[in-house]
């Protein structure tokens, strides 16, 4: 009887090591896909927020006489409810149009899970207003808290918001 000195085939240890390496590679790929999905979601939210801010800015541009009323209306949550007069189908004053515009834009933002605010921009001397649109755990405010959008003229690193400087 002749005995073999060399091993033939693949041992169980080699197979397990290969499976472990494959599993680590697959986990890396899954993590990469997850980050890509997060980045896509963030981009979609930013585009929607920019569109909402642009919508309000264009409405303000079209109704400059109601400028002071826009900030007042958007800063008061009770004023952001649906406005009873439809200024698209009937004549409205500049103030009523501002009320209507704010209710329309805030309604769009709320439908997307976003909050809005409008305040005088920090760091400028010409009285320009900034439109804040925030989503997620961020509020459309300026401050030093974890949920604030900005601190003065700088975005907070954990915030998810967009600011547009306007009239």
Predicted regions mapped to residue ranges:
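Hydrophobic alpha-helical segments, especially transmembrane helices
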Residues: 34-36, 47, 55
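Amphipathic alpha-helical recognition patches that constitute DNA-binding helices
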Residues: 11, 48
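C-terminal juxtamembrane segment of a hydrophobic transmembrane alpha-helix
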Residues: 21-41
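N-terminal leader/signal peptides at the extreme start of proteins
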Residues: 1-10
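Flexible, low-complexity segments enriched in proline/glycine/serine and punctuated by aromatic residues
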Residues: 41-43, 50-167
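Mobile, glycine-rich extracellular loop/lid and propeptide segments
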Residues: 2, 19, 24, 58-61
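Alpha-helix N-cap/helix-initiation motif
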Residues: 5, 38, 42-45
């Amino acid at each position: 009887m002749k005995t073999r000195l060399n091993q033939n085939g693949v041992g169980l240890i080699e197979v397990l090591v290969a499976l472990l390496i494959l599993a680590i590679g697959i986990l890396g790929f899954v993590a990469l896909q997850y980050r890509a999905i997060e980045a896509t979601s963030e981009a979609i939210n930013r585009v929607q927020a920019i569109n909402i801010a642009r919508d309000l800015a264009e409405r303000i541009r079209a109704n400059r006489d109601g400028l002071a009323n826009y900030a007042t209306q958007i800063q008061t949550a009770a004023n952001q409810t649906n406005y009873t007069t439809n200024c698209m189908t009937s004549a409205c004053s500049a103030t009523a149009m501002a009320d209507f515009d704010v209710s329309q834009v805030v309604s769009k933002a709320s439908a997307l899970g976003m909050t809005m605010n409008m305040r005088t921009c920090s760091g400028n001397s010409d009285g320009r207003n900034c439109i804040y649109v925030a989503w997620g755990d961020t509020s459309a405010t300026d401050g030093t808290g974890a949920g604030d959008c900005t601190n003065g003229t700088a975005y907070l690193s954990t915030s998810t918001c967009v600011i547009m400087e306007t009239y």
